[in-house]
């Protein structure tokens, strides 16, 4: 999923959870999306760190 859409969906589910609550299916989706987001961020950090050179 594209990062922008991933973040939009995570934010939507968060707001909905505060206003109306989430169904079990939505809670599972929220957890899956958050895990996917974290994996993307971890991958980005690893790439950035691999480009760092010792001086």
Curated annotation (Swiss-Prot):
GO cellular component: cytoplasm
InterPro entries registered for this protein in UniProt: DUF896
Transmembrane segments annotated in the record for this chain: none
UniProt keywords, alphabetically: Cytoplasm
Location within or outside the cell: Cytoplasm
SUPFAM superfamilies hit by this protein: YnzC-like (SSF158221)
HAMAP family: UPF0291
Family statement: Belongs to the UPF0291 family.
Protein name (Swiss-Prot/TrEMBL): UPF0291 protein CA_C2726
Natural source organism: Clostridium acetobutylicum (strain ATCC 824 / DSM 792 / JCM 1419 / IAM 19013 / LMG 5710 / NBRC 13948 / NRRL B-527 / VKM B-1787 / 2291 / W)
